A protein has these predicted regions:
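Bacterial N-terminal signal peptides that target proteins for export
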Residues: 1-9
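Bacterial N-terminal signal peptides
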Residues: 9-16
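Helical hinge/lid and interdomain linker segments adjacent to catalytic or ligand-binding clefts
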Residues: 43-156
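Class I SAM-dependent methyltransferase SAM-binding "motif I" and its flanking Rossmann-like core
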Residues: 132, 148-194
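Catalytic beta-strand/loop cores that center a nucleophilic Ser/Cys/Thr
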Residues: 178-247, 255, 259-262
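Non-catalytic extracellular/lumenal accessory regions of secreted precursors
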Residues: 279-330, 406-414, 418-422
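Acidic, Ser/Thr/Pro-rich low-complexity intrinsically disordered segments
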Residues: 309-360, 369, 377-383
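Noncatalytic accessory or regulatory domains flanking protease catalytic cores in secreted, cell-surface
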Residues: 346-420
Length: 422
């Protein structure tokens, strides 16, 4: 029998992992671009039009609805994905070392408190860790509430994520179409001129929130404003964002619902939001500066809480540097497997021009297997960037209710290796 991520998935007709790989781009060092959360108490969508139009890869969590019925199995399966399971101990959002496995998360509309509660404290912490490690976050309606600390009615909900460390305000507006204006200095104008009039018509709104300028925290920015005179939301933030520092991901909250539109300025709006979140992705971190003659073992598991020495995940890069001395005749970089872990494809790259990536590195070894060597004759003195890339990944299998992981599930908990410069 073929291994599956969740062999008991057939017990539930509610949860699926839907995968659309429009443009797998391993040079970025992420497994996929977007993870769309349509879990418990959220709208479950099969695809995101903006991801399709931007040619971004996406995977989606879908669960049961009130009309179809929600069972304990739905909760167990959602949290097996997001919190962890035997195949993936720290969950689908994170690599074994805690780095983000996706470039960003998108959270659908629905009921924020109920979804946050369903995530459990451990699941909410996975989202916080994802953003802290550099993953982006975009949420609309319920997803916007969920990002915040709380609201004017209750400034601190334990069910919320608090990745935007401030409050929002309930617009008290249901099932209406609203207009949106684009401030002249909005960063979203980098991606679209929105027809030249800085105005977007007929964006659906159903219980969403807004950001009062008086409540905007330092470092946050309002990207779009409501144009709806009958309500206090008028002239206040419709979409706002926050990036805590250079190493964290950008968090963006959107009160209304542009996400399902397939053409026109409302699609432009959603595309611009996604692109600005992705623009906030920080540069990868260097694991260590290697010393010639000193092997470095990357064998720790997630539970060891030692990211600098933790195993590599699927489609992930580990980056290193080494200082090449004057007069060096030959430089050898060796990648070695540990017993029982030979059957993985790890690539080796080196570059003097910044981070060593597939497609841009002068020196490379992309042979099959893990054990390999890269030899550089007469290397120039200076800083040489090295990287290890794990090309082994899971496969996806289409099922009636979506796509499951199959094949190399073992890679999800990471591949250990040793790297040595001589």
């Amino acid at each position: 029998m073929k291994n599956r991520y969740f062999p008991f998935l057939t017990l539930s007709l509610c949860l699926s992992l839907f995968s659309t790989a429009h443009s797998q781009t391993p040079e970025r060092g992420f497994y996929k671009d977007i993870y769309m959360d349509g879990g418990l108490s959220l709208t479950s969508k099969q695809y995101l039009p903006s991801a399709r139009s931007l040619m971004l890869s996406i995977e989606t969590l879908r669960t049961g609805t009130k009309s179809l019925g929600i069972t304990d199995v739905d909760t167990l399966l959602q949290n097996a994905l997001l919190v962890g399971n035997e195949f993936d101990t720290n969950g689908i959002l994170l690599y074994p070392d805690g780095a983000p496995r996706y470039r960003m998360v998108y959270v659908n509309g629905g009921t924020a408190k109920s979804h946050g509660r369903s995530l459990t404290p451990e699941g909410r912490e996975r989202f916080r860790a994802f953003v802290k490690a550099g993953g982006g976050y975009l949420g609309s309606c319920a997803g916007a509430y969920l990002a915040c600390e709380g609201t004017h009615g209750n400034p601190h909900y334990e069910e919320y994520l608090g990745i935007y460390p401030g409050i929002c305000t309930n617009a008290q507006l249901q099932n209406k179409r609203v207009c949106v204006t684009v401030p002249a200095d909005s960063p979203l104008l980098r991606y679209s001129d929105f027809g030249g009039d800085l105005h977007i018509d007929s964006v659906y709104h159903n219980g969403g929130c807004y950001m009062d300028y008086a409540d905007l925290i330092p470092g946050a920015e309002i990207l779009l404003q409501y144009d709806y005179p009958p309500k206090p939301m008028h002239g206040n933030g419709c979409v706002w964002s926050y990036k805590a520092d250079e190493q964290t991901g950008r968090v963006m909250a959107c009160g209304p619902h542009p996400e399902g539109i397939v053409s026109g300025e409302r699609l432009d709006m959603m595309e611009a939001m996604v692109q600005y979140v992705l623009e906030g992705t920080p540069q990868p971190r260097i694991k260590a500066s290697l010393t010639k003659g000193e092997p470095r073992l990357m064998s720790c598991k997630t539970e060891d809480n030692d990211p600098a020495h933790t195993r590599i995940g699927d489609k992930q890069y580990h980056h290193f540097t080494v200082e090449v001395p004057e007069g060096c005749d030959t430089l050898k970089i060796k990648l070695s497997s540990l017993e029982g872990y030979q059957n993985y494809d790890l690539f080796l790259f080196a570059s003097y021009e910044g981070l060593a990536m597939l497609g841009s590195s002068k020196y490379k070894n992309v042979g099959q297997g893990l054990d390999k060597e890269l030899v550089i004759l007469a290397p120039k003195a200076g800083t040489l960037f090295l990287s290890v890339f794990c090309d082994t990944t899971v496969e996806s299998e289409e099922a009636r209710y979506g796509t499951m992981y199959t094949g190399r599930l073992d890679v999800l908990n990471g591949v250990p290796y040793q790297i040595l410069v001589e």
